[in-house]
Amino acid sequence: MIIKVCGMREPENIRAIEQAGADWMGFIFFPQSARYVSHRPEYLPEQCHRIGVFVNESSENILLKAQEFGLHHIQLHGRETPEQCRKLKAAGLGVIKVFSIAQESDLQSAGCYEGVCDYFLFDTACSGYGGSGKTFNWNILQAYRGKTPFLLSGGLRPGSLSLLLQFKHEQWAGIDLNSGFETAPALKDDAAVHTFINQLKQKIQ
């Protein structure tokens, strides 16, 4: 079970969340986000995989950020095409494509990205690009028959543990935590994250 904590920015908070047990850590390179990372922090995680989050960004700029931040994966939240995903994957980056889910038909577009992404991320549909703080109906995902593993996102918070323990899917690979564990934009409650990760990993391997 991959535990990704997204929307990180502040050096000491990065260090604390790394020590709390996160597997992956996300950095948002979308200027309109309240969690936008405008420059390289003084500390970047050494034990976590670094994930760069982009929205409708050019491949050239993505590759530059990947080099600057030592990114392992890129997470694409916009209208990126399967061809762009394929080229970025060929450049040596892990690719995570995000799909906004409100109904079963929203899963159909994922089929075009099979084979060119390492993971999908299913998030709650909203007017913006993620960060809604709301949970969608996870039962919709039982209709997903793809071969690409996925991360579950959208409104996860400390009280979500029981729901996660009930959820089952053979392609479910991990979860994405963000605003539900924040004390302010880009600042995570490391104690809450640590407790949640420990409780989850005791129950799910």
From Swiss-Prot:
Source species, domain of life: Bacteria
Swiss-Prot/TrEMBL keywords: Amino-acid biosynthesis, Aromatic amino acid biosynthesis, Isomerase, Tryptophan biosynthesis
PANTHER family on file: N-(5'-PHOSPHORIBOSYL)ANTHRANILATE ISOMERASE
Gene that specifies this protein: trpF
Gene3D superfamilies tied to this protein: Aldolase class I
Taxonomic source organism: Phocaeicola vulgatus (strain ATCC 8482 / DSM 1447 / JCM 5826 / CCUG 4940 / NBRC 14291 / NCTC 11154)
GO biological process terms held by the UniProt record: L-tryptophan biosynthetic process
Name the record gives this protein: N-(5'-phosphoribosyl)anthranilate isomerase
Molecular functions (GO terms): phosphoribosylanthranilate isomerase activity
SUPFAM superfamilies reported in the protein's UniProt record: Ribulose-phoshate binding barrel
One Pfam entry name: PRAI
Pathway(s): Amino-acid biosynthesis; L-tryptophan biosynthesis; L-tryptophan from chorismate: step 3/5
Signal peptide per UniProt: none
EC number(s) given by UniProt: 5.3.1.24
Family membership noted in the UniProt record: Belongs to the TrpF family.
Record field: catalytic activity: N-(5-phospho-beta-D-ribosyl)anthranilate = 1-(2-carboxyphenylamino)-1-deoxy-D-ribulose 5-phosphate
